[in-house]
């Protein structure tokens, strides 16, 4: 769709990253951290044009002098003023569009509180004057992006993980499970175990370095105990990483110990089940007749499912839990980091979807509650 005139905007607001672009495109045009930064100190030099807040990459690059805040925690918007800044930045600075000229599709976490959807709707129509909007559940969009309408999605991002069983395009709310264990926790855990090695990472700025180490070097072991033995016996699993100041650090078993916490949350001092067991429990909460379809369509989605080895390990773990006769398939699309956005892009450009938008007129007549009647 080269005609960006009235094409819909698709904005996937994650706890860690905001993905935004135009419906019909195959990838988001803008991907930036969901952060708002405010100066720690008043500017010393008058007239330096220091802003009172920075969003996204600019906040990231000036992180040394700022206090960084994430307006989305565990997938759910908790700070609306900052969130408005993120949306403003998305429309005006990243996409460079006038929001009053384009319908906008927003995404939400599964089990998002009703009041939250209403507030999102209100801000779009009242602050940004959107002509039309829609709110879609993230995991459902990931499933659409994989070309399915039935399956179970494990969506794991920076702030939260969910297992969402979906049948014929509808999420089954009674069987959705939430796990407050995701990318940010793994970054914190890696910071902690690197400290045990004698490297010190403490500030928010250093946390970003550790996040980069995690994304570049970590992987999921097929057999954790065996991998630990290999790591202890030789240096074959060690990798080095150069810090911004030129210092080189070595990382060994931390490479697979970090994401192992997804399967063994006790590593983080959490009592919850691992992601494999959460998927299994989610399936077991569904009607017995659809379980077979769910086992055969396990879709991974989100940045925290990007570790090499995660699909094989999931296959192994779920096979061990499920009945022996059942066929289990894990689908891990290479673009799964952005599959929520891609699903939104597909949905918003379908001709059949055009009647689903909530228009400004409907909003003016019914108020924010309209979102519960039109988006499900």
Curated annotation (Swiss-Prot):
Transmembrane segments: none
Post-translational modification: Oxidation of Met-45 to form methionine sulfoxide promotes actin filament depolymerization. Methionine sulfoxide is produced stereospecifically, but it is not known whether the (S)-S-oxide or the (R)-S-oxide is produced.
CDD domains: ASKHA_NBD_actin
Keyword Cytoplasm: yes
Residues excised as propeptide: 1-2
Membership in a protein family: Belongs to the actin family.
Alphabetized InterPro entries for the sequence: Actin, Actin/actin-like_CS, Actin_CS, ATPase_NBD
Catalytic activities: ATP + H2O = ADP + phosphate + H(+)
Lineage: Eukaryota, Metazoa, Ecdysozoa, Arthropoda, Hexapoda
Predominant localisation class: cytoplasm
EC number: 3.6.4.-
The keyword Nuclease is annotated on this UniProt entry: no
N-acetylaspartate modification, residue list: 3
UniProt superkingdom: Eukaryota
Tissue spec. comment: Muscle.
A Pfam family per the record: Actin
GO molecular function: ATP binding; hydrolase activity
Physiological role: Actins are highly conserved proteins that are involved in various types of cell motility and are ubiquitously expressed in all eukaryotic cells.
Designated name of the protein: Actin-5, muscle-specific
UniProt KW keywords: Acetylation, ATP-binding, Cytoplasm, Cytoskeleton, Hydrolase, Muscle protein, Nucleotide-binding, Oxidation
Leading EC class: hydrolase
Residue numbers of Methionine sulfoxide PTMs: 45, 48
GO cellular component annotations of the record: cytoplasm; cytoskeleton
Intracellular or extracellular location(s): Cytoplasm, Cytoskeleton
